[in-house]
Amino acid sequence: MRLRLIAVGSRMPKWVEEGWHEYAKRLPSELAMELVEIPLNTRGKNADVARFIRQEGEAMLAKVGQNERIVTLEVHGKPWSTEQLAVELDRWRLDSRTVNFMVGGPEGLAPEVCARADQRWSLSPLTLPHPLVRILIGEQLYRAWTVLSGHPYHK
C-alpha cells in the first residue's frame, strides 16, 4: 500500500521538507509515503482565482489512478483521533489501494476534487498554514502506524 500526499504548492522552506521526509523515512517500506507537489498558479490582484482552483484540481486528479482512494483535507471534514486514524489506516492497508491525501491551495480544493473524495478529513477547525499541514499529515500517519504496530512512540 502506498500513501501519497498531493498538495498544491511547491518550493517549501527547508524545515517543511525536512519535517515531511523525517516521518516518511520512519514508515516501513510496505507503507511508503510519497509527496506530489502541484505548482501553485501565481495570484495577482486581477487573477481568475476560480480558473486557477479548477486547473489545480485537474492537475491533482490527474495524479490519481482510477481505483485509488481519495481523502480530502477539509475544514468541514471528519475529525479523527489518533486511534480512529489508526483504525482507518488499518482498513486502508487491508484494502491495499493507494491512498491519496489531497491538500488544496490558499483558496481550498476544487469542487471536482471534493466530489471524488472517498473520505473527508479535518485536522482541526483552525485554519492551518499549508506547509505545516504537510508535516502534520506525515506525523499523524506515522503515529497511527505506531499505534497499530505497538511501537512506544504514541505513549
UniProtKB/Swiss-Prot annotation:
GO terms for molecular function: rRNA (pseudouridine-N3-)-methyltransferase activity. GO terms for cellular component: cytoplasm. Pfam families: SPOUT_MTase (PF02590). Its main location: cytoplasm. It catalyses: pseudouridine(1915) in 23S rRNA + S-adenosyl-L-methionine = N(3)-methylpseudouridine(1915) in 23S rRNA + S-adenosyl-L-homocysteine + H(+). It is found in: Cytoplasm. Keywords: Cytoplasm, Methyltransferase, rRNA processing, S-adenosyl-L-methionine, Transferase. The keyword Methyltransferase applies. The keyword S-adenosyl-L-methionine applies. SUPFAM superfamilies: alpha/beta knot. S-adenosyl-L-methionine binds at residues 73, 104, 123-128. Homodimer. Belongs to the RNA methyltransferase RlmH family. This is Ribosomal RNA large subunit methyltransferase H. It comes from Pseudomonas fluorescens (strain Pf0-1).
